[in-house]
Amino acid sequence: MNELTPREIVVELDKYIIGQEQAKRMVAIAVRNRWRRQQLQEGLRDEVAPRNIIMIGPTGVGKTEIARRLAKLCHAPFIKVEATKYTEVGYVGRDVESMIRDLMEISINLVRKEEAEKVRERAEVLAEERLLDLLLPIGENRDATREKLRSLFRQGHLKDREVDIEVQEQTQPIGILNVPGMEQIGNQMKDAFSRIFPQKTHRRKMKVSAAWEHLVGEESNRLVDNDKLTDLARERVEQMGIVFIDEIDKLASASQHRSSDISREGVQRDLLPIVEGSAVNTKYGLIKTDHILFIAAGAFHLSKPSDLIPELQGRFPLRAELEALGKNEFYRILTEPDNALTRQYEALLETEGVKIVFTDDGLKEISAFAEDVNTQTENIGARRLHTIMEKILADISFDAPEKFGTTLEVTKEYVVSYLEDIRANTELSRFIL
């Protein structure tokens, strides 16, 4: 369990997300409470439930990013789902329990990577021996030749040589069951058939570098204890899992329209036992959801949280309102985060030998323009910056291979030259930006 304090969590989130202090503090406390729960005596520990959160705010203000960065920070299994993709039990489509099954698959992959890393050193030794067996010609002085090949391989001189290697055929899930809501049955049948019938293999030519990684992966899988892996993954889901339910507002309906939205209300009622705490059946066994943290999010333009059914409102006791972003926040987004868009474009074009320099007045003009377009058309928050940056850098991105060694200064004048026609024509900005 991660032992970061709430203040340390907020500091880490500040590296990637601008503003939204209330939401950051709320999720930081929720994560710290998990660590606090682990310190309690067993009887009391089981009684402490997570405080689920509803984030309220327009699109592009950081709701999803806060949850995603939080999960990475805690090395927790994380899944983002859209509430509108689920249907009430009895209708064609995915039922809400599938989000827990998907979360378990994510946890399995997460723990498998960690366990494979622990045995990688041993796996590399075994993979090297198998690779030398493939490279070694039949003849005399095999030991001496083997050591020469080992030396050449470790020095990287053999990476482009090709070898024939046996690889397992990748089987696809049974096609007839590849319809929404039937994936679980398809996967179970696939697993059953794989146990009955032997896995087919075929010979494939690979470069030594690719064969090396393939063999290391095979040996790692053999060394990892799958029963232990499943137990660790299940515990990780039950104790640290985070489910982010986006567009929860689309399930809410104002009281005057409630009679026509029976299916939406049905999905809300199906969510109740999972959020409250129940056992979901997966191919890895039962997963208890009692201590999984659920974070719901929505813009709530046409509805409000109180339009959700009362029982579901009670399962999300914490509310965080995220503020709409203006030009000041856009400027900070372009300059402060470690992964700022400006740094991304600088790095991308530097691979072609083109240097981009963003001036302060250029960045302020981009920020002001993003605010104007969001005000006049749809407010899509920080995502507007992506479309504007693509527009003003489209020419240099196209011509970069012929511009090796040049420097481009993105000034206010440069930005205006690309955007003034769009600014003057509101209808044009609706289509282009």
From Swiss-Prot:
A single GO cellular-component term on record: HslUV protease complex
Highest taxon, organism lineage: Bacteria
Keywords of this entry: ATP-binding, Chaperone, Cytoplasm, Nucleotide-binding
Entry annotated with the keyword Nucleotidyltransferase: no
Transmembrane segments annotated in the record for this chain: none
Molecular function (Gene Ontology), one example: ATP binding
Pfam family, any one: AAA
GO annotation (BP), single: protein unfolding
SUPFAM superfamilies for this protein: P-loop containing nucleoside triphosphate hydrolases
Record: residues binding ATP: 18, 60-65, 246, 311, 383
Principal cellular location given in the protein's record: cytoplasm
Cellular compartment(s): Cytoplasm
SMART domains, A to Z: AAA, ClpB_D2-small
Family of this protein: Belongs to the ClpX chaperone family. HslU subfamily.
Assembly, per entry: A double ring-shaped homohexamer of HslV is capped on each side by a ring-shaped HslU homohexamer. The assembly of the HslU/HslV complex is dependent on binding of ATP.
Function: ATPase subunit of a proteasome-like degradation complex; this subunit has chaperone activity. The binding of ATP and its subsequent hydrolysis by HslU are essential for unfolding of protein substrates subsequently hydrolyzed by HslV. HslU recognizes the N-terminal part of its protein substrates and unfolds these before they are guided to HslV for hydrolysis.
NCBIfam families from the UniProt entry: hslU, PRK05201.1
Record's protein name: ATP-dependent protease ATPase subunit HslU
Source species: Lawsonia intracellularis (strain PHE/MN1-00)
